[in-house]
Amino acid sequence: MTLLNYLHCNRSKSFLFQRFYSPYRIAHKLFDGSSQRNATTSINHSISESLRRNSPARALSIFKENLQLGYFGRHMDEVTLCLALKACRGDLKRGCQIHGFSTTSGFTSFVCVSNAVMGMYRKAGRFDNALCIFENLVDPDVVSWNTILSGFDDNQIALNFVVRMKSAGVVFDAFTYSTALSFCVGSEGFLLGLQLQSTVVKTGLESDLVVGNSFITMYSRSGSFRGARRVFDEMSFKDMISWNSLLSGLSQEGTFGFEAVVIFRDMMREGVELDHVSFTSVITTCCHETDLKLARQIHGLCIKRGYESLLEVGNILMSRYSKCGVLEAVKSVFHQMSERNVVSWTTMISSNKDDAVSIFLNMRFDGVYPNEVTFVGLINAVKCNEQIKEGLKIHGLCIKTGFVSEPSVGNSFITLYAKFEALEDAKKAFEDITFREIISWNAMISGFAQNGFSHEALKMFLSAAAETMPNEYTFGSVLNAIAFAEDISVKQGQRCHAHLLKLGLNSCPVVSSALLDMYAKRGNIDESEKVFNEMSQKNQFVWTSIISAYSSHGDFETVMNLFHKMIKENVAPDLVTFLSVLTACNRKGMVDKGYEIFNMMIEVYNLEPSHEHYSCMVDMLGRAGRLKEAEELMSEVPGGPGESMLQSMLGSCRLHGNVKMGAKVAELAMEMKPELSGSYVQMYNIYAEKEEWDKAAEIRKAMRKKNVSKEAGFSWIDVGDTEGSLTMQGFSSGDKSHPKSDEIYRMVEIIGLEMNLEGKVAV
């Protein structure tokens, strides 16, 4: 008989029973509770250790095994469930199963379990489910709020939630501050960030490293270098993230290049460990600087520290060298990289346009799939008409891969086809774009305008204005089209002017210059001057536009005054400016002043004269009768004289009756462009004026033999006064194509007689 049975049987010995049995029962209960706690701790430790070793599958397996053994409730608790949910790592199916089990077993009443469930749904991409659970929590803690806050992907919604947290009296912790500050972008977000900074002291987190780093990032992203630096300097302890946050923010801003380099230097002096973020940030800074030497020094440091072959560092180095046009350095970095992605290959394609297609093929062979930026680089590599077939192949590949509907790709195709005058293909590319931005419309309008299709440009502008909001480049292109179109009424330009005034775009230099140029080319120089005077900021383009306007109107004195004022304002003239000034000198017959300006362009501003500059000088000398000097200057033109220069020289030979030189120049012009009538007509007139009729007849005979005919000259008249008037009526000498031509000729005769009676001279 056991002692226990004995004690039960012998009740008379109650003292012994109480003495021995009661302590045994208590000890058994204590032992059972202790072993249960130890078992729970052991299971939780096993799951936690698996997670620490990045083995979520093993963690879930341990949870499942113990669940099957029926240990839940005895050896597993709310901590076990939290760890199991953490192990799901976005596995929605298992997460939902554990969530269901937590609900049926009543463990969702523990706020930590609900937090874990919300975290699981957030990681699985089911943020709505997490939000629904949160809204039904009776007493959410700060972790609950933080879990939801970290799940937002919209800055404004996240900031509204932060305001809600403040209103609910939630005491922010370091995670709350760092997460909230990551959403503080833009002016509204920055203001909220400043408010949060004022509350940090109250929570005692002003010295927290994570919070300090978050404030540095917020200030840096908002472009407040002083604010970021102040937070940085006030931090009692700084880690590598602190330095990198300051450095990265400055490099992205782009206007604090020098400061970023100084901070990088200080990091090295302080012995702070540099990582790939440090190097990519400072190299990005070099992209904003013109000092290539600095970039090479940092590159050398990358090599010493073993970071050159890293993907992020290699890509940013390639980008830097590409922007500087150092192709060999781009290639060198590319070949040193141990890993390459689409950014690496795309940079190579964009940098090396001559071999862009072969690089693209190697990229595909390497198993890297292109993106829209890759195709934009490929399209831009098509440089001449002979390569247009390559462009068509690229277009076909874009159609197959679906990138043709991407706006950036479509816009590049529009620009490409417009450059090579393939406007039907440009229209097709435009129609293939699914969501047309204003850039797409601008590309089409500009393409039509540049190719002389002014009516189409105007119609495209009207369609764009009906569908989207035009910007300064839209107006710049359409005004350019109107400026050069003699058969479009100037009223259309005035309507565009009124439209852009309503949109507040009149202060944009691009728009003002286009307006100024349009009015000048259409004969309204007073309106051009008015636009110019109303501009608060005048850049090189604006000055050139007003000088060109007065030059086209033959106002030499005003041109020279504006030119000298431009220089006095420290605005450097460019080739177009000098061409306009030379044109004014030519029309005024100021040859010596023209020579002075021509030499200034070369010697003072180091500008290489173009064919147009030489042509203007040759014409200027020729008109002044200095034909020998003109001939000598013509022989100095790089690549030889062009057709327009020869025509100009031929006109001067006719003006001064130099038959011998005229014949020589005409022969060169006819060899260059045998199909054009200008040289034949000019030479015929030279012979006719000298009464050398036999030679004049030979010119006529040569024209008939080569089927060369003189092109008819056209004039235009604006007769429309209605709002819908888009065009002007064109006519040529002796033109009778109009159905009312007889009435028109009679009216012209009457007007001519009336002009004579008024003392006016008809021209």
Swiss-Prot record:
Residues 724-756 are annotated as: Type E(+) motif. It holds the Pfam family PPR_2. One of its GO terms (biological process) is positive regulation of mitochondrial mRNA catabolic process. PROSITE patterns: PPR. The keyword Ribonucleoprotein does not apply. It is found in: Mitochondrion. It comes from the Eukaryota. The keyword Mitochondrion applies. InterPro entries: E_motif, Pentatricopeptide_rpt, PPR_At4g14850-like_plant, TPR-like_helical_dom_sf. Residues 645-720 are annotated as: Type E motif. Residues 1-38 form a transit peptide. GO terms for molecular function: RNA binding. One of its GO terms (cellular component) is mitochondrion. PPR repeats lie at residues 77-109, 110-140, 141-172, 173-207, 208-238, 239-274, 275-309, 310-344, 350-370, 371-405, 406-436, 437-471, 472-507, 508-538, 539-573, 574-604, 610-640. Keywords: Mitochondrion, Repeat, Transit peptide. Belongs to the PPR family. PCMP-E subfamily. PANTHER family: (WILD MALAYSIAN BANANA) HYPOTHETICAL PROTEIN, PENTATRICOPEPTIDE REPEAT-CONTAINING PROTEIN. This is Pentatricopeptide repeat-containing protein At4g32430, mitochondrial. The lineage of its organism: Eukaryota, Viridiplantae, Streptophyta, Embryophyta, Tracheophyta.
